[in-house]
UniProtKB/Swiss-Prot annotation:
InterPro entries: Mur-like_cat_sf (IPR036565), Mur_ligase_C (IPR004101), Mur_ligase_C_dom_sf (IPR036615), Mur_ligase_cen (IPR013221), MurD (IPR005762). This is UDP-N-acetylmuramoylalanine--D-glutamate ligase. It comes from the Bacteria. It comes from Pelobacter propionicus (strain DSM 2379 / NBRC 103807 / OttBd1). It is found in: Cytoplasm. Cell wall formation. Catalyzes the addition of glutamate to the nucleotide precursor UDP-N-acetylmuramoyl-L-alanine (UMA). Keywords: ATP-binding, Cell cycle, Cell division, Cell shape, Cell wall biogenesis/degradation, Cytoplasm, Ligase, Nucleotide-binding, Peptidoglycan synthesis. GO terms for biological process: cell division; cell wall organization; peptidoglycan biosynthetic process; regulation of cell shape. It catalyses: UDP-N-acetyl-alpha-D-muramoyl-L-alanine + D-glutamate + ATP = UDP-N-acetyl-alpha-D-muramoyl-L-alanyl-D-glutamate + ADP + phosphate + H(+). ATP binds at G115, T116, N117, G118, K119, T120, T121.
Length: 446
């Protein structure tokens, strides 16, 4: 891809936008960056662009800048419906995402992992397995470092593992992973997409450019995933914790069994540090992605056994008076809360926050069967109570700290208190990490 002397516009100056601008400038492009924030708000980002001849267009998006560019690179947080992007698209300007730009230069085999939930855990495990097997590996994408930073560093690698969001897939054209994984599908980001269907279609683009030489790792237990996997050009490689597979990877009686091209490997799950049924799926997906690209079973099993839960994903906080407390602040949608509820019994569930637009009714069965007490907080509390409040003992709390105190009073020894919000955090907190820290502090103060 020739960039020298091309007029390239980078839209959005978060971490990804800054990395793209630096890379493009290093390749001789005439780069302009645009962001609706002002210079004071962007001081840190702008300092990273100093001395590179990059033009700035702040507090506005000029239509002429968009339509007169040769190429536009869009940051993930920028919606497709931005009027200036629509105008540029109609004018025939090539518009791509950062992952599309990076993939045009990456030479190593690329593993791309998406899904509504579990992406970060599965991506991190996959990267760790490659490293344990001796491959020089870059792990990034929607977590950690943008893919484009690998190119800017010019560090030689043998494997690339990327967590990919639906936002990043919106502007791909030739993005083609050697292995693409779709972990699951459930309602999310309906504040961004016009419909659930539109969200699903964005996710499915991860397979769009694959051929029969590539692999599609898919969840055989997810009806939506399997429905949309029919007709994929890539070689289908399913994983399941519910059914035995002739070709794929599945769980049976304490073993993960891998079957591929007549070969079988067995991985005992005893001793795994990572707990929860959803994490069993993440582990199988990670093993599939890595074993399909030449990792060895012994080293891979050793890596999986040692892996511990990432922060804010069903993380154990403490045990007090016979009650175990867990923090799952990253569970910002219904699908992730379903997986958490499947992992415990006798639960006091703390949920709520900023409503993202989906229905909470898919939680009904698990709330009825497993949740003894439901404590609701935040903007979504009213609607959650309407949909779930008749299924179990339900209370409201004005603050997270009040919710923790109430949960401590309600939960009998042998029970579990789980904060798994099913909502984003922005009504009460800066982000999900601040929500987690406040919860942990309140629990430890009991």
């Amino acid at each position: 891809m020739e960039l020298n002397d091309k007029k390239v516009l980078v839209v959005g100056l978060a971490k990804t936008g800054v990395a793209c601008a630096r890379f493009l400038a290093s390749r001789g492009a005439r780069v302009t960056v645009t962001d609706m924030r002002d210079e004071a708000a962007l001081a840190g980002q702008l300092a990273l662009l100093e001395g590179r001849g990059i033009r700035r267009e702040l507090t506005r998006h000029d239509a002429g800048t968009f339509t007169q560019s040769h190429l536009i690179v869009v940051s993930p947080g920028v919606p497709r419906t931005l009027p200036q992007l629509v105008m540029a698209h109609e004018a025939g300007v090539e518009i791509i995402s950062e992952i599309e730009l990076a993939s045009r230069f990456i030479q190593a085999p690329l593993v791309a992992i998406t899904g509504t939930n579990g992406k970060t855990t599965a991506t991190t495990i996959t990267g760790d397995i490659f490293i344990k097997n001796g491959f020089r590996t870059f792990v990034g994408g929607n977590i950690g470092n943008p893919l484009i930073e690998l190119l800017e560093s010019a560090e030689p690698v043998e494997r690339v593992v990327a967590e990919i969001s639906s936002f990043q897939l919106e502007w791909i054209r030739a993005f083609r992973p050697a292995v693409a994984a779709l972990l699951n599908l459930s309602e999310d980001h309906l504040d961004r997409y016009a419909s659930y269907r539109e969200y699903i279609e964005a996710k499915l683009r991860i397979f769009e450019n694959q051929t029969a030489d590539d692999y599609a790792v898919v969840n055989a237990d997810d009806e939506l995933v399997m429905e949309h996997s029919r007709g994929l050009r890539a070689c289908l490689f399913p994983f399941s914790r519910k059914q035995e597979l002739d070709e794929g990877i599945f769980h049976r009686e304490g073993l993960i069994v891998w079957r591929h091209n007549g070969r079988e490997e067995r991985f005992p799950t005893a001793g795994f540090r990572l707990q929860g049924v959803h994490n069993l799926e993440n582990i199988m997906a990670a093993l599939a992605c890595s074993l399909l690209l030449e990792c060895r079973p012994t080293e891979s099993l050793a890596c999986v056994r040692e892996f511990e839960a990432l922060h804010h994903r069903m993380e154990f906080v403490r045990e007090l008076n016979g009650v175990r407390w867990y923090e799952d602040s990253k569970a910002t949608n219904v699908g992730s809360v379903e997986k958490a509820l499947e992992s415990f019994d006798a639960i006091t569930l703390i949920a709520g926050g900023k409503d993202k637009g989906g229905s909470y009714s898919p939680l009904s069965r698990l709330v009825r069967e497993r949740v003894r007490h439901l404590v609701l907080i935040g903007e979504a509390a009213g609607r959650m109570q309407e949909e779930l409040g008749t299924l179990t003992d339900t209370r409201r709390a004005a603050t997270l700290e009040e919710a923790v105190s109430l949960a401590a009073e309600l939960t009998a020894p042998g029970g579990t208190v789980l904060m798994s919000p099913a909502c984003s955090s922005f009504d009460m907190f800066r982000d999900y990490e601040e929500r987690a820290q406040r919860y942990i502090a309140a629990v430890k103060a009991l």
